[in-house]
Amino acid sequence: YITIGLTLAIVVIFYIVGYKIYISQEGIYLRKIDLMVDWSEVEGLSHVWINEFRSRTGNANFYNRKTLVIYRKDYKPICVYNISLLSLFVAKLYSPKIKTNIVFASLATMVNVGLNGWVFYQLFFAGLESMNLGILFAWMGLFFLKALILPVIMTSLENRTHGDNLFHDTAYEKNRSKVVHL
């Protein structure tokens, strides 16, 4: 009963909120700009993390936007921000011949989930008294890798494959990527 209740709650929430993209056998429909991209136009798909720089009064932080990038043959790529890795799997299901970075994106997501799970376990089950300085430094190093190094590697690999289109935000420039932003 819990599973059915959760499923219904999720369906109702997403029905109210709406969707960003719709993936079908014909192609990918982008709701925000009312554009249908046929599979024949799609050169490749990738799921990358693009760092967004946010600056508020006295506060500055990076946020990793999980982004689906749709590379088109004769046009600029399209970035759909804050979207799940599952969209890449669904696209691969409908168009198996399309080039993707599904393996590397899946590994990066597993690292993210594993690291967050480790922190959750340590804080809520093992307790703070079992944590020592070595674990704290390990967390700091792994979060540095996750937040800064991994997104840079992901975008540089995609830029090497599809041309220099994806760039991270800096303190001086936002949305530097040469793409259509959604």
Question: What is each stretch, according to the model?
Answer:
Residues 1-16, 46, 125-132, 136-138:
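N-terminal first transmembrane alpha-helix
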Residues 1, 15, 19-22, 29, ...:
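Sequence-level detector for tyrosine residue identity
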Residues 31-89, 182:
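Non-transmembrane, membrane-adjacent beta-strand/coil modules in membrane-associated proteins
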Residues 6-46, 152-173:
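Conserved beta-hairpin
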Residues 72-182:
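Terminal and domain-flanking low-complexity segments
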